[in-house]
């Protein structure tokens, strides 16, 4: 069926016949298919040299939003292929990676203009082979973890610390005290993990075998 689609400011404004809007650019798409934009849930483009902060078992305090490169030609290629939105993820060198960036691709814009505002919060985790291969062998003989049991212990230790940190802040806030000098020390790493415990941040996790998936859940 022959139909017009009116697009304003990057969004569909109307669908119908014989639509017009002053000086709008007209694209004749007869014989072609029009589909919704593709959402890429797992992407590493536009963050060259900023993917992995793998020096520690956890880098939950860092965010991919700080290293988005709006001049990466892959943005243009993604748009040409129909990708409109992506989740840009930290790498998988450590069990607990950095915070993700949710972006809507626009060519020729500043990095800040690509970031979704008030979007759901995400963070990158990794299990099994990703972490083990980053740490394994003679190059890193003393790096922890090097096994699946070590990866599991990392999550146990960090979430226990995050639970204690979150409880300390909740007790302080409930006390009604206004003296910030007596407040718990702010820790962005544990604060991020506490958001997961409070269902305010979601995990995107590289996974391999059933046992470790069940472990994380």
Residues covered by each model-derived region:
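Histidine-rich, glycine-flanked metal-binding segment
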Residues: 1-35
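A fold-wide structural signal in alpha/beta-hydrolase
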Residues: 4-6, 39, 84, 144
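Glycine-rich nucleotide phosphate-binding loop and flanking beta-alpha elements
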Residues: 13, 19, 45, 93-94, ...
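Polyanionic/metal-chelating signatures
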Residues: 79-217
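Metal-associated gating/positioning segment near the N- to mid-region
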Residues: 29-101, 109
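A structural micro-motif
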Residues: 24-25, 60, 201
């Amino acid at each position: 069926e022959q139909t017009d689609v009116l697009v304003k400011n990057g969004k569909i404004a109307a669908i119908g016949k014989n639509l017009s809007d002053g000086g709008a650019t007209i694209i004749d798409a007869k014989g072609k298919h029009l589909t919704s934009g593709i959402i890429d849930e797992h992407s590493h483009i536009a963050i060259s040299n900023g993917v992995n902060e793998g020096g520690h078992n956890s880098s939950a305090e860092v965010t991919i939003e700080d290293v988005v490169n709006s001049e990466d030609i892959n943005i243009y290629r993604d748009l040409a292929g129909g990708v409109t939105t992506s989740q840009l993820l930290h790498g998988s060198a450590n069990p607990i990676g950095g915070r993700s960036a949710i972006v809507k691709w626009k060519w020729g814009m500043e990095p800040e203009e690509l970031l979704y505002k008030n979007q759901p919060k995400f963070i990158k985790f990794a299990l099994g082979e990703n972490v083990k291969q980053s740490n394994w062998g003679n190059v890193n003989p003393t790096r922890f973890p090097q096994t699946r049991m070590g990866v599991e212990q990392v999550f146990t230790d960090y979430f226990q610390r995050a639970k204690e940190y979150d409880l300390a802040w909740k007790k302080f806030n409930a006390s009604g005290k206004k003296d910030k000098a007596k407040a718990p020390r702010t820790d962005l790493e544990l604060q991020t993990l506490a958001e997961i415990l409070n269902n305010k941040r979601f995990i995107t996790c590289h996974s391999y075998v059933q046992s470790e998936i069940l472990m994380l859940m």
